[in-house]
Regions:
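Glycoside hydrolase catalytic-domain context in secreted enzymes
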Residues: 1-271
Length: 271
Protein backbone atom coordinates (compact mmCIF):
# COMPACT_ATOMS: atom_id res chain seq x y z
CA UNK A 1 0.00 0.00 0.00
CA UNK A 2 2.85 2.40 0.85
CA UNK A 3 4.51 1.47 -2.45
CA UNK A 4 8.08 1.49 -1.11
CA UNK A 5 8.92 -2.15 -1.75
CA UNK A 6 8.62 -3.29 1.87
CA UNK A 7 5.88 -4.04 4.38
CA UNK A 8 5.38 -1.18 6.81
CA UNK A 9 4.03 -1.75 10.31
CA UNK A 10 0.58 -0.42 9.38
CA UNK A 11 0.44 -2.92 6.51
CA UNK A 12 1.51 -5.89 8.64
CA UNK A 13 -1.29 -7.98 10.17
CA UNK A 14 1.15 -9.41 12.71
CA UNK A 15 1.12 -6.12 14.63
CA UNK A 16 -1.75 -5.03 16.89
CA UNK A 17 -4.39 -2.59 15.59
CA UNK A 18 -2.99 0.07 17.96
CA UNK A 19 0.55 -0.38 16.63
CA UNK A 20 -0.62 -0.27 13.04
CA UNK A 21 -2.77 2.83 13.63
CA UNK A 22 0.07 4.67 15.38
CA UNK A 23 2.47 3.86 12.56
CA UNK A 24 -0.05 5.08 9.99
CA UNK A 25 -0.64 8.32 11.88
CA UNK A 26 3.09 9.08 11.88
CA UNK A 27 3.15 8.80 8.10
CA UNK A 28 0.06 10.92 7.42
CA UNK A 29 0.25 14.54 6.30
CA UNK A 30 -1.98 17.22 7.81
CA UNK A 31 -4.12 17.10 4.66
CA UNK A 32 -4.57 13.34 4.97
CA UNK A 33 -5.56 13.68 8.62
CA UNK A 34 -8.06 16.41 7.78
CA UNK A 35 -9.58 14.12 5.16
CA UNK A 36 -10.50 11.65 7.90
CA UNK A 37 -12.79 14.28 9.46
CA UNK A 38 -15.25 14.31 6.53
CA UNK A 39 -18.12 11.89 5.98
CA UNK A 40 -19.92 12.87 2.75
CA UNK A 41 -22.76 10.91 1.13
CA UNK A 42 -22.37 8.94 -2.10
CA UNK A 43 -24.93 7.31 -4.36
CA UNK A 44 -24.21 3.98 -6.07
CA UNK A 45 -27.29 4.07 -8.28
CA UNK A 46 -25.55 4.14 -11.64
CA UNK A 47 -22.75 5.29 -13.88
CA UNK A 48 -19.15 4.17 -14.07
CA UNK A 49 -17.18 4.16 -10.87
CA UNK A 50 -15.53 7.49 -11.72
CA UNK A 51 -18.95 9.02 -12.51
CA UNK A 52 -20.52 8.27 -9.12
CA UNK A 53 -21.15 11.76 -7.83
CA UNK A 54 -20.87 13.04 -4.29
CA UNK A 55 -24.30 14.39 -3.29
CA UNK A 56 -22.85 16.95 -0.87
CA UNK A 57 -20.45 18.53 -3.35
CA UNK A 58 -21.55 21.61 -5.24
CA UNK A 59 -18.45 21.33 -7.44
CA UNK A 60 -19.43 18.01 -8.95
CA UNK A 61 -16.41 16.10 -7.64
CA UNK A 62 -16.42 12.41 -8.41
CA UNK A 63 -15.90 10.04 -5.54
CA UNK A 64 -12.66 8.99 -7.23
CA UNK A 65 -11.42 12.58 -7.01
CA UNK A 66 -12.46 12.86 -3.37
CA UNK A 67 -10.51 9.71 -2.53
CA UNK A 68 -7.32 10.46 -4.46
CA UNK A 69 -7.16 14.26 -4.34
CA UNK A 70 -8.94 15.21 -1.12
CA UNK A 71 -7.96 12.25 1.06
CA UNK A 72 -11.53 11.46 2.16
CA UNK A 73 -11.97 7.85 3.30
CA UNK A 74 -15.37 7.83 5.07
CA UNK A 75 -18.60 7.77 3.04
CA UNK A 76 -22.32 7.55 3.79
CA UNK A 77 -24.26 5.38 1.34
CA UNK A 78 -27.28 7.04 -0.29
CA UNK A 79 -29.06 4.54 -2.48
CA UNK A 80 -28.04 1.37 -4.28
CA UNK A 81 -29.48 -0.66 -7.20
CA UNK A 82 -29.16 -4.09 -5.52
CA UNK A 83 -26.76 -5.89 -3.14
CA UNK A 84 -24.75 -7.50 -5.96
CA UNK A 85 -24.10 -4.22 -7.74
CA UNK A 86 -23.44 -2.48 -4.44
CA UNK A 87 -20.75 -5.00 -3.48
CA UNK A 88 -19.10 -4.70 -6.90
CA UNK A 89 -19.08 -0.91 -6.82
CA UNK A 90 -17.75 -0.73 -3.26
CA UNK A 91 -15.00 -3.19 -4.17
CA UNK A 92 -14.10 -0.93 -7.09
CA UNK A 93 -13.97 2.05 -4.75
CA UNK A 94 -11.62 0.14 -2.43
CA UNK A 95 -9.36 -0.54 -5.42
CA UNK A 96 -9.25 3.19 -6.07
CA UNK A 97 -8.34 3.79 -2.42
CA UNK A 98 -5.38 1.43 -2.83
CA UNK A 99 -3.97 3.89 -5.37
CA UNK A 100 -3.81 6.71 -2.82
CA UNK A 101 -0.44 7.56 -1.25
CA UNK A 102 -0.99 5.45 1.86
CA UNK A 103 -3.65 3.10 0.53
CA UNK A 104 -5.99 3.78 3.46
CA UNK A 105 -9.14 1.65 2.97
CA UNK A 106 -12.55 3.28 2.82
CA UNK A 107 -15.13 2.98 5.57
CA UNK A 108 -18.62 2.90 4.07
CA UNK A 109 -21.57 3.55 6.36
CA UNK A 110 -25.33 3.54 5.96
CA UNK A 111 -28.51 4.62 7.66
CA UNK A 112 -31.03 1.81 8.28
CA UNK A 113 -31.75 -0.07 5.03
CA UNK A 114 -33.88 -2.93 6.35
CA UNK A 115 -37.16 -1.23 7.21
CA UNK A 116 -40.40 -2.06 5.45
CA UNK A 117 -40.75 0.70 2.80
CA UNK A 118 -42.46 3.77 4.19
CA UNK A 119 -40.53 6.76 2.82
CA UNK A 120 -38.27 7.38 5.78
CA UNK A 121 -36.43 10.32 4.20
CA UNK A 122 -33.27 11.17 6.12
CA UNK A 123 -34.24 8.73 8.85
CA UNK A 124 -34.15 5.41 6.98
CA UNK A 125 -34.07 3.77 3.59
CA UNK A 126 -35.39 0.50 2.24
CA UNK A 127 -32.96 -0.96 -0.27
CA UNK A 128 -34.02 -3.79 -2.55
CA UNK A 129 -32.48 -7.17 -1.87
CA UNK A 130 -32.03 -6.77 1.88
CA UNK A 131 -34.23 -8.47 4.46
CA UNK A 132 -37.17 -6.39 5.72
CA UNK A 133 -37.95 -5.66 9.36
CA UNK A 134 -40.02 -3.26 11.48
CA UNK A 135 -38.78 0.17 12.49
CA UNK A 136 -37.13 0.57 15.87
CA UNK A 137 -40.49 1.51 17.38
CA UNK A 138 -41.92 -1.74 16.05
CA UNK A 139 -39.10 -3.68 17.67
CA UNK A 140 -39.67 -1.82 20.93
CA UNK A 141 -43.32 -2.92 20.91
CA UNK A 142 -42.18 -6.54 21.24
CA UNK A 143 -40.42 -5.78 24.54
CA UNK A 144 -37.96 -8.53 23.60
CA UNK A 145 -34.28 -7.49 23.35
CA UNK A 146 -33.38 -10.95 22.04
CA UNK A 147 -35.43 -10.29 18.88
CA UNK A 148 -33.60 -7.00 18.37
CA UNK A 149 -30.25 -8.75 18.76
CA UNK A 150 -31.29 -11.45 16.29
CA UNK A 151 -32.24 -8.79 13.73
CA UNK A 152 -28.93 -6.99 14.27
CA UNK A 153 -26.95 -10.20 13.78
CA UNK A 154 -28.72 -10.88 10.47
CA UNK A 155 -28.36 -7.27 9.33
CA UNK A 156 -24.66 -7.36 10.27
CA UNK A 157 -24.09 -10.32 7.95
CA UNK A 158 -25.87 -8.48 5.14
CA UNK A 159 -23.84 -5.32 5.74
CA UNK A 160 -20.57 -7.26 5.71
CA UNK A 161 -21.50 -9.12 2.53
CA UNK A 162 -21.61 -5.86 0.54
CA UNK A 163 -18.80 -3.98 2.29
CA UNK A 164 -20.64 -1.78 4.81
CA UNK A 165 -18.66 -1.51 8.07
CA UNK A 166 -20.50 1.20 10.02
CA UNK A 167 -24.21 1.40 10.87
CA UNK A 168 -25.45 4.97 11.35
CA UNK A 169 -27.92 3.68 13.92
CA UNK A 170 -29.61 2.93 16.29
CA UNK A 171 -31.45 6.05 17.36
CA UNK A 172 -31.41 6.15 21.15
CA UNK A 173 -33.33 9.41 21.38
CA UNK A 174 -36.37 9.30 23.64
CA UNK A 175 -39.68 10.08 21.93
CA UNK A 176 -41.05 12.57 24.45
CA UNK A 177 -42.14 15.20 21.89
CA UNK A 178 -45.15 13.82 19.95
CA UNK A 179 -44.78 16.41 17.19
CA UNK A 180 -41.29 15.25 16.23
CA UNK A 181 -41.40 13.47 12.86
CA UNK A 182 -38.74 10.89 13.73
CA UNK A 183 -40.39 9.22 16.70
CA UNK A 184 -40.97 6.07 14.64
CA UNK A 185 -37.19 5.64 14.40
CA UNK A 186 -36.67 5.50 18.18
CA UNK A 187 -37.23 2.81 20.79
CA UNK A 188 -39.92 4.95 22.43
CA UNK A 189 -39.94 7.28 25.43
CA UNK A 190 -38.80 4.94 28.22
CA UNK A 191 -35.11 5.47 29.02
CA UNK A 192 -34.63 2.08 30.68
CA UNK A 193 -36.20 0.15 27.81
CA UNK A 194 -34.35 2.23 25.24
CA UNK A 195 -31.10 1.44 27.04
CA UNK A 196 -31.80 -2.30 27.01
CA UNK A 197 -32.78 -2.27 23.34
CA UNK A 198 -29.76 -0.17 22.38
CA UNK A 199 -27.43 -2.67 24.08
CA UNK A 200 -29.09 -5.60 22.28
CA UNK A 201 -28.80 -3.72 18.97
CA UNK A 202 -25.12 -3.01 19.57
CA UNK A 203 -24.35 -6.57 20.61
CA UNK A 204 -25.88 -7.94 17.44
CA UNK A 205 -24.02 -5.59 15.12
CA UNK A 206 -20.61 -5.29 16.72
CA UNK A 207 -20.46 -7.81 19.58
CA UNK A 208 -19.04 -7.20 23.04
CA UNK A 209 -15.54 -7.16 21.54
CA UNK A 210 -14.72 -5.48 18.25
CA UNK A 211 -13.33 -7.89 15.67
CA UNK A 212 -13.06 -8.36 11.91
CA UNK A 213 -16.70 -9.49 11.75
CA UNK A 214 -18.04 -6.45 13.59
CA UNK A 215 -20.09 -3.64 12.09
CA UNK A 216 -19.70 -0.57 14.28
CA UNK A 217 -22.89 1.04 15.56
CA UNK A 218 -22.99 4.84 15.60
CA UNK A 219 -25.56 5.49 18.33
CA UNK A 220 -27.41 8.78 17.80
CA UNK A 221 -28.20 11.57 18.49
CA UNK A 222 -26.06 12.46 21.49
CA UNK A 223 -26.93 13.77 24.06
CA UNK A 224 -30.57 13.00 23.24
CA UNK A 225 -32.57 14.57 20.41
CA UNK A 226 -36.10 13.46 21.25
CA UNK A 227 -37.49 16.62 22.88
CA UNK A 228 -36.99 18.89 19.88
CA UNK A 229 -38.37 22.39 20.39
CA UNK A 230 -41.86 22.44 18.84
CA UNK A 231 -41.07 19.06 17.28
CA UNK A 232 -38.89 20.66 14.59
CA UNK A 233 -35.98 18.54 13.38
CA UNK A 234 -32.44 20.03 13.34
CA UNK A 235 -31.73 18.55 9.92
CA UNK A 236 -33.74 21.60 8.82
CA UNK A 237 -33.02 25.29 9.37
CA UNK A 238 -36.22 25.65 11.39
CA UNK A 239 -35.17 23.18 14.09
CA UNK A 240 -32.03 24.65 15.59
CA UNK A 241 -32.97 24.63 19.28
CA UNK A 242 -32.53 21.59 21.51
CA UNK A 243 -34.55 21.75 24.73
CA UNK A 244 -35.12 19.45 27.71
CA UNK A 245 -38.46 20.41 29.33
CA UNK A 246 -38.81 19.56 33.00
CA UNK A 247 -35.04 19.48 33.54
CA UNK A 248 -34.97 15.99 32.02
CA UNK A 249 -31.52 16.18 30.45
CA UNK A 250 -30.11 13.30 32.52
CA UNK A 251 -33.09 11.13 31.62
CA UNK A 252 -32.45 11.62 27.90
CA UNK A 253 -28.74 11.03 28.41
CA UNK A 254 -29.22 7.63 30.05
CA UNK A 255 -29.30 5.40 26.92
CA UNK A 256 -26.11 7.05 25.67
CA UNK A 257 -24.28 6.51 28.94
CA UNK A 258 -25.23 2.85 28.84
CA UNK A 259 -24.11 2.57 25.22
CA UNK A 260 -20.74 4.12 26.02
CA UNK A 261 -20.29 1.63 28.85
CA UNK A 262 -21.09 -1.15 26.36
CA UNK A 263 -17.97 -0.52 24.26
CA UNK A 264 -19.45 2.12 21.96
CA UNK A 265 -16.75 3.30 19.53
CA UNK A 266 -18.54 5.96 17.47
CA UNK A 267 -21.34 8.35 18.37
CA UNK A 268 -23.36 10.90 16.38
CA UNK A 269 -24.19 14.24 18.01
CA UNK A 270 -27.29 16.12 16.93
CA UNK A 271 -26.94 19.01 14.57
Amino acid sequence: LYKNGKIEIYENINFTPEQRANDLLKKMTIEEKVGQMFHPPISINGGTISEIMNLASGRGDTTESLILNKNITHYNLYGSPNPSQLAKKLNQLQKIAERSRLGIPLTISSDPIHEVPRGGGVAAFSLKGFSKWPSQLGFAATRQPEIIKEFAEIAREEYLSVGLRTALHPMSDLATEPRWSRNFGTFGSNADLSSDFTIAYMDGFQGKKINSNSVLTMVKHFPGGGPQEDGLDPHLYSGQNQVYPGNNFEYHLKPFKNAINNNLKVIMPYY
